[in-house]
Amino acid sequence: MLKQENGRIIYHYDAEELWIESWGKNAVRIRATKNAEMPKDNWALLSAEEVETQIEITEDGATLRNGKVKVSISNGGKITIYNQKGKLLLEEYWRNRRDLRDSKCSAIEVEAREFRPNVGGDYHLTMRLQSLDKNEKIYGMGQYQQPYLNLKGADLELAHRNSQASVPFAISSMGYGLLWNNPGVGRVVFGNNIISYESYATKVLDYWFVVEDTPAKIEETYAKATGTVPMMPEYGLGFWQCKLRYQTQEELLEIAREYKRRNLPLDVIVVDFFHWPKQGDWKFDADYWPNPDEMIRELEAMNVKLMVSIWPTVDRESENYEEMLEKGYLIRTERGFRTGLNFEGATIHYDATNPNARKFLWEKVKTNYYDKGIKIFWLDEAEPEYSAYDFDNYRYFRGTDLEIGNIYPVEYARTFYEGMQAEGQKNIVNLLRCAWAGSQRYGALVWSGDIASSFESMRNQLAAGLNMGLAGIPWWTTDIGGFHGGDPNDPAFRELFVRWFQWGTFCPVMRLHGDREPRQPQYGTTGGAHCCSGAANEVWSYGEDVYKICVKYMNIREKMRGYTRKLMEEAHIKGTPIMRTLFYEFPEDKECWEIEDEYMYGDKYLIAPILEAGVNERRIYLPVGVQWKECNCGRIYYGGQYITLTVSLDSMPVFERI
């Protein structure tokens, strides 16, 4: 049965009800359920703006038109989507005999919208789409630790892990974007025959589909539908210093003083984890941080902001555990002991999906940090990280982990964003280790997690950062040098560090962090002092030659402050990525769709990172239609060609578009 009601097409067959409706200009939202009522959650989507929509119902089916997008559904329930030129962009993969007039009718009985019942009332949902073009390229989808920018052929887990962030918005070279608007754990396969999305426990199929002429327009329309980042504050434009971990107040202050003695630019310095007595206390340990107010005043006098690490984990011995347990503010386990992460104590995470738990945490943070003058937070463990990722074992206020777990980093960011906003703060940014669709509107700056210190890892981060931008997360960064290991006295690591530092200069936020070797002696025996501290990780820790290169690139970053501010304005207003694939800026240049190891920092600078050890040459493609100035020497090149540059350790190829 097909009908028009409340500005949408409604299709009903057996237990399934399906809605097709406009959701912004040139975009539609499609939902289906086998429950008695359609779930009302919007998840990543903001409320829809009203747009002109034409709906037509005929003997053969129904059609909805909205600007550049046309959606058709047959009487048999099959959906197809076209652009304004009549090009087929999406076709559901039905293989049955419900409609014998369908050219693809078949006896193999495969459903495009398969709701397989789970015990307890949810469904294991599979949506199948026909792969229409063997040359299609697909981008976005968040952050995965792999070198592939083009995801066609990829098999991706729709779940968060430390260094993996599922942000399920895909951009296609065919001229569309698709948001899988379901925060449940699942899987997507961008196959050459079938594109399939799965949710392992859900009540509804829900996706949003946009048609536009360029990747930039797709991204901007998506940003209107899901929100944009705030304006980046001034301290987000420069250099951030961090390591695992400064153990005392005096140690951290002495590092900041040394930066100032050397006349080096420094915007933010970081107090890392285990500055607290117990996980879940959310306060400074007075044995090692005796006067945070005085520390913050001294840093402010140096024009340096202090960022403090917050973990969502709560130790059984924390002063807040019993109250949070009694009030239902902790994530639950379906079986076994209530432990999610076994690291420096058996801990469980606060339940960010519970509004009262969000309020409780913020009040603790406000009293112990914010009211002292700390206005930027490092929200670690945001996936949340589990010692065992048994997604079927955790239950939140809003549902099971399998059903809604990917929403956690959004609600974690929201906890702080709304708390800070209520205090009158504007231009809010907080650093998180994970994101889902919509995280950007809560001031989430995502970093790529606990990654290896290797050239292979660095290559993976380049792909991850570009795909995160295309997935709608323009604020993104990495640990310069990688996280795990790396000895500042090792020549091989120094080379990696230099190459990563050069690249980090042209990332949205330039942030130095890592767990360097060898580990340092433990300072103290109580509270957070039980946690380790890595070797020195300041720019002068790597020898004089490396130091000179670091200073050069820190000053380059400073000189670009005005330009970077402009890019942040574009991200705030339109949702534009800071790091952009070549095809984002040059969609008509076919070669740009093939390049995966270069990118644009905004619209002006082409960046060609050095991604291997021992490199003395770099092959670079310069997009067609403009001229390019090599920033190191001023030489001018015509676009539309490959060039080979000789490279030395003290410089990375950068070209200015002229």
Place the predicted regions along the sequence by residue.
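Short, glycine-/Ser/Thr-/acidic-enriched flexible segments
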Residues: N35, M174-Y176, P183-V185, T214, ...
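Generic recognition of flexible, low-complexity loop/linker segments
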Residues: G7, E17, D155-L158, A165-V167, ...
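N-terminal accessory segment at the very beginning of proteins
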Residues: M1-T226, P230-G236, C242-L244, Q249-R257, ...
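Active-site-proximal structural scaffolding
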Residues: Y13, N162-S163, I171, Y200, ...
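Short, well-ordered loop/turn elements at secondary-structure boundaries
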Residues: D14, T58-E59, R65-G67, N75, ...
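Carbohydrate-binding surfaces of carbohydrate-active enzymes
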Residues: Q4-E21, N263, E298-N303, Y417-K426, ...
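Aromatic- and carboxylate-enriched substrate-binding clefts and catalytic-loop regions
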Residues: N35, E92-Y93, P265-Y547, E585-F586
